[in-house]
Each structure stands twice: as structure tokens, then as C-alpha cells.
Amino acid sequence: LTAIRRLMLESNGLVTIAFRRSLIKQGTGKPISDIGEEEYDLSNKWLTSPYCQIEPAMAFQLGLPVLILREKGVIAEGILEVLPDGYGFLKGVLGVYMPEFDLNCNLDDYFKSKEWIQIIQKWEGYVRKVVDNKGKPPMLY
């Protein structure tokens, strides 16, 4: 983790791509939960690399802009979880929209889409702000 943190300190932002990595053929989430939560089926769902959880959390703690893309089928849990924002959109737990992509679709079309252009321009703006603010004294409030 020290090496990752060192790289983060030298960075101005982070892009994480949560690709499908490990397939759960048959599984159950929260089986026999003692806190009253319902169990759910995890069969034929995908896990991604644990670094897709670790690195965005570290970047967030350092105040870096984080953009996460999640491949369709990857379990949306932890930092990859999406929640309704009250306006009909789903946002990630970091408070920004988290796009889901499908490798079976034409990605060139997605990268030309209005959705992608808005997302990447917004993230780029956050990164530019980090670059502008580096070297300035920290502000507590």
C-alpha cells in the first residue's frame, strides 16, 4: 500500500476501470445474516480486482478526483455501489455518476456519446483544479 500511496501523492486524479475478473458460478450474499438483512443470489455474477476498491478509496482520502467505470455484470458493492440520487440517476458512493460499460457493445460509440463527454469533461475539470491548487497552503475550511 505504501507504493500505491506514493504514486497517489504524485497524481492529480484517478481513473479506475472495474473489469470482470472472477465469476461466481453459484453463491449467496448475506446468508443466515444475524442483522436481519435479506440474503440475495450471487450466482453468475462477477467480481473485479480488489484494487478497484482500494485505490479509489485511497485517492478519495487524499482529495483526488476519482472516476470509476464498472463493466456490466460486476457486482456493485462497496465503492462500486450505486445509489439513486433523487433525480432518477444513479450515483456512486463517491457522489458522482458511475458509468457502466458493456464490452459486447461498440465502445467507440460510447466514447463519442454525450454522456461520456460530460463525464470526462467534469472529471478533467476536477483534475485541473487539483493541478491549480497544488503547492498552495492547505485550507481547513
Predicted feature descriptions by range:
Residues 1-60:
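TIR-domain catalytic/interaction hotspot
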